[in-house]
Regions:
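Catalytic Walker B motif of ABC-type/P-loop ATPase nucleotide-binding domains
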Residues: 173-177
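Helix-to-loop junction immediately C-terminal to a conserved catalytic motif
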Residues: 62
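Conserved ABC ATPase signature
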Residues: 123, 148-152, 156
Length: 270
């Protein structure tokens, strides 16, 4: 067995607990003693059932939420010590849903994705222009630059959102179920583009995904969040086993092979 190569830590969640106070005065625990480390250049898929705390974990990494217990670090410093604009530039988020303003062209929206960290509406410096142009190219959105956002298809809209995130020139890219509104062909295309960007830019990527086979094909490392805890973390073949899937997701699956020999999970035939 080949030993794993250690990478320099970029972000870490250590012993983190988080919960919400409900309207009736009770407390709902969402995360319980979560541990997750992301090295520079890591590509990790985060999977779990609905309500297991995946989106909450992303919000803790952005500093939008603060943990009730434990520590969240980015680049060696507690997230709480970072100035929000500084952290927001280095940690980009591709959300499940983002309401875009009407009447703006794609290039203008990508400029907005770059500019808020400089306290202005549109990018204006030469460095801004280079970052916006590169973001459009890397996201495969150059041909969309003069289109209005409301004219875009689902797949084109996702390319716009990727470009807006890349315009920040982040170190960490967080994806919250980026494929949820796409058909299979566009899901595969988007994830392939993210893989390419990770390799090209050296990004660290943490992607919340709901399709286990897509997660296994996308990332060399998969973490499973169940009932507020990371219950498995490692290569897909070690983590996404039939017994783990049955225990966490309550679904009976079998390991199968595609025609070209790739492993995948198939529903168990009764």
């Amino acid at each position: 067995m080949t030993a794993a190569v250690a990478t320099e830590e970029l972000a870490a969640v250590e012993g983190v607990a988080f919960g919400y106070r409900l309207s009736d005065g009770n407390h709902r625990d969402v995360l319980r003693s979560v541990n997750l480390t992301l090295g520079r250049g890591d590509l990790v898929a985060l999977v779990g059932t609905n309500g297991s705390g995946k989106t909450t974990l992303l919000r803790l990494l952005t500093g939008i939420l603060q943990p009730d217990a434990g520590a969240v670090r980015f680049d060696g410093r507690p997230v709480a010590e970072w100035r929000r604009p500084e952290l927001a530039r280095r940690v980009a988020v591709l959300p499940q849903q983002l309401d875009l303003p009407v009447g703006f062209r794609v290039a203008e929206l990508v400029e907005m994705g770059r500019a808020p960290h400089a306290r202005r509406l549109f990018a204006s410096t030469e460095a801004d222009a280079r970052a916006v142009s590169r973001a459009l190219a890397d996201a495969g959105a150059l041909e969309l630059a003069d289109r209005y956002a409301e004219e875009l298809s689902g797949g084109e809209r996702q390319r716009l959102l990727v470009a807006m995130a890349l315009a920040q020139e982040p170190d960490l890219l967080l994806l919250d179920e980026p494929t949820v509104h796409l058909d299979l062909a566009h899901q595969v295309a988007l994830l392939a583009a993210i893989q390419h960007l990770r390799d090209q830019r050296g990004l660290t990527v943490l992607a919340v995904l709901h399709d286990l086979n897509l997660a296994a094909a996308f990332a060399p490392r998969v973490a499973i969040l169940d009932d507020g805890r990371i219950v498995a973390d490692g290569p897909p073949g070690d983590v996404l086993t039939p017994d783990v899937v049955q225990r966490v997701f309550g679904v009976a699956v079998d390991e199968a092979r595609t025609a070209d020999g790739r492993r995948h999970l198939a529903l168990h035939e009764v």
